[in-house]
Swiss-Prot record:
Modified residue annotations for Phenylalanine amide: 36
Protein name: Peptide Hp1239
Lineage: Eukaryota, Metazoa, Ecdysozoa, Arthropoda, Chelicerata
GO BP terms, alphabetized: defense response to bacterium; regulation of defense response to virus
Positions of the propeptide segment: 40-67
Broad class of where this protein is predominantly found: secreted
Signal in keyword set: yes
Tissue occurrence: Expressed by the venom gland.
Keyword line: Amidation, Antibiotic, Antimicrobial, Antiviral protein, Cleavage on pair of basic residues, Membrane, Secreted, Signal, Target cell membrane, Target membrane
Compartmental location: Secreted; Target cell membrane
Family designation: Belongs to the non-disulfide-bridged peptide (NDBP) superfamily. Short antimicrobial peptide (group 4) family.
Function: Amphipathic peptide with antibacterial activities. Shows antiviral activities against the herpes simplex virus type-1. It potently inhibits the initial infection by provoking the rupture of viral envelop and the dissociation of proteins from the virions (EC(50) is 0.41 uM). It also effectively inhibits viral attachment (EC(50) is 5.73 uM), viral entry (EC(50) is 4.32 uM) and viral proliferation after infection (EC(50) is 8.41 uM). Morever, it enters mammalian tested cells (Vero) and reduces the intracellular infectivity.
Amino acid sequence: MKTQFTVLLITLVLFQMLSQSEAILSYLWNGIKSIFGKRGLSDLSDLDELFDGEITKADLDLLREIM
């Protein structure tokens, strides 16, 4: 009885690992396809607006408040 219970638990754990890894791999594959697809490469120029190298007075005030 203990052996059957142990085999059942191990089987359940392995099935859970398989289902989670399949979901993670499909999520990663969709992300890779969206990055390297035709539309994905043209949309990367939109990210340039997020990285502004200038520090404004408001940024300095926020940093002072944090410290």
